[in-house]
Structures are given as C-alpha cells and as structure tokens.
Curated annotation (Swiss-Prot):
Keywords recorded for this protein, A-Z: Calcium channel impairing toxin, Cardiotoxin, Disulfide bond, Ion channel impairing toxin, Secreted, Toxin, Voltage-gated calcium channel impairing toxin
SUPFAM superfamilies with a match to the protein in the record: Snake toxin-like
Pfam families assigned to the protein according to its UniProt record, in alphabetical order: Toxin_cobra-type
Name assigned to this protein: Toxin S4C8
Species assigned in the record: Dendroaspis jamesoni kaimosae (Eastern Jameson's mamba)
Top-rank lineage group of the source organism: Eukaryota
Length: 60
C-alpha cells in the first residue's frame, strides 16, 4: 500500500507500507486545521480524530 506520510504544512511525501491501511489524523482548532498522515490505523486520543482507509494514496 502507498500512503501519504507528511504533516500539515510540509511537502507531500509518500511511503510504501507493509500494512493494508493508511490514516489521516487531524484536529481543528479555532485558528487552524492540523493534520498528519501515515501508514496503519492508529487510535486517536481526544481531541484528535482519525480517518483510516484502504487504497493507494487514499489519505489525501
């Protein structure tokens, strides 16, 4: 599986991952939207939210 693996304001990067899922973890604050992308499907702790998906580059 090929997943995006970058944080909010960084240039987009991809990585070939062993697992079958990619994730996008994010938090919305009053001033900005912060996100992080990577391989797998980690459990998010409040106030973060995680979206997991299966498919190459699905975590845009």
């Amino acid at each position: 599986r090929i997943c995006y693996t970058h944080k909010s304001l960084q240039a987009k990067t991809t990585k070939s991952c062993e697992g079958n899922t990619c994730y996008k973890m994010f938090i919305r604050t009053s001033r900005e939207y912060i996100s992080e992308r990577g391989c797998g499907c980690p459990t998010a702790m409040w106030p973060y939210q995680t979206e997991c998906c299966k498919g190459d580059r699905c975590n845009k």
